[in-house]
Structures are given as structure tokens and as C-alpha cells.
Design a protein with these regions (language model features):
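Composition-driven recognition of glycine/serine/threonine/acidic- and proline-rich low-complexity segments
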Residues: 14-202
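Bacterial Sec-dependent signal peptides at the C-terminal "C-region" and cleavage site
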Residues: 3-14
Length: 202
């Protein structure tokens, strides 16, 4: 009986960690890439995409608010990320473990305002978009450092609100509203994308 209990504990302890978003996209769609759409020293907007008929289709639009100041042990990896590398993959390869304390969930209601986002996601018409926000913390030995606050806006072809909740569980502080915060964060990107479209059309 004791041996069986020990084996059960070993199996439980050896369960694989949750997939990174990049890993989940590749597993579901067969490919993965990241493209930085807009970035400065404070914030990065990026498309986490897979290829469909050779073209990138956004599965998650990620808005990353970087820690300020950036902790010294993270600066080298941070430069790679600012240059366009995947956040999760970069820190994982550098030996950091990743923790994602959840801040909250919400849904961006379907609206023509997000037309350019829908285009990136390959959607033909407006649709509700599941969003969630979390802190990205990095752990190595006795060190625990906060890197960023991240908001992820998911294509309904990838993750629905129900699926997001199943994957990430409940916020430790209880449900919170994130749609207003994410809407505000998206404003500069939407303006830039609209301007780019107008310039190309003109």
C-alpha cells in the first residue's frame, strides 16, 4: 500500500508543466511564429500566429507592459524579446521557470472598431474575443522577478472564454474586469493600424 502511494505521488509530481501559449498554438495548428507589430521601451504588441495556406493568421494578440525598471538579470533576454523573440521560449531556454498569476478575464464584445484585429485573425465578421490578463514572473533558484503584465486577446478559432478559464483557472483575488483596461491598451495600436491602412489605400 505504501509503495502504491509513493508511486502515485511520483506520477503526480512528474506531471508536465502547462504548455506555453506558443507551444499550444503549434500543437493545435501545426506551426507557430511571433511578429512584433509595434513596440517601445514600455509596451509591445505582437501577433502570435500560425500559418494557413502559407500566410500568418493571428491566434493571440499579446499586449506586454514591461516592468520599469527592468530587473538587471533579465535585461539580456529582454533585448532578444524586444527584437522579436518569443517571451516564453526565450526565458525557458535561458533556464527561467515561468509563473503567471492571473489578474482577470473578460470578453471584448464584437465591434467594427476592432476590424483590423479581426483581419489579422482571419475573421470575416466581428466576433467576441476572449481576453485575460496576468503578471509574468520568472523564477530561478531563490530568485523571483516580475517581468511584465500581459494581456492576451484570443481568436475564437483558437480559444473561447470557456477554454481560457479551463486552462488558467480562477484569479487568486476573485474575478475582475479586464475589458476596459485592454480596450485602452489597444487604442494606440488600432490608431496605428488604421493609419497604415489609410496610407496604403491613398
Amino acid at each position: 500500500m505504501l509503495a502504491a502511494t509513493c508511486i502515485a505521488l511520483l506520477v503526480s509530481c512528474s506531471s508536465p508543466p502547462p504548455l506555453l501559449n506558443s507551444e499550444r498554438i503549434e500543437q493545435r495548428f501545426g506551426s507557430y511564429g511571433v511578429e512584433v507589430i509595434r513596440a517601445d521601451e514600455n509596451i509591445r504588441y505582437s501577433s502570435l500566429h500560425s500559418l494557413e495556406n502559407g500566410e500568418p493568421v493571428t491566434r493571440t494578440l499579446a499586449v506586454v507592459e514591461f516592468a520599469d525598471p527592468m530587473p538587471a538579470p533579465l535585461r539580456a533576454a529582454h533585448q532578444q524579446i524586444v527584437s522579436g523573440e518569443s517571451i516564453g521560449a526565450t526565458f525557458k531556454s535561458a533556464g527561467w521557470s515561468i509563473d503567471k498569476p492571473l489578474l482577470g478575464y473578460d470578453v471584448l464584445a464584437a465591434s467594427p472598431r476592432f476590424g483590423r484585429v479581426y483581419e489579422l485573425m482571419g475573421l470575416d465578421e466581428p466576433a467576441p474575443l476572449a481576453v485575460h490578463r496576468y503578471r509574468l514572473q520568472l523564477l530561478q533558484g531563490d530568485e523571483a522577478l516580475e517581468y511584465a503584465t500581459i494581456s492576451e486577446i484570443h481568436s475564437p478559432a483558437y480559444l473561447t472564454a470557456e477554454e481560457v478559464r479551463e486552462i488558467y483557472g480562477q484569479p487568486s483575488s476573485g474575478p475582475t474586469t479586464t475589458a476596459t483596461a485592454v480596450d485602452d491598451l489597444l487604442a494606440p495600436l488600432l490608431e496605428e493600424l488604421s493609419s497604415a491602412t489609410g496610407s496604403a489605400g491613398g
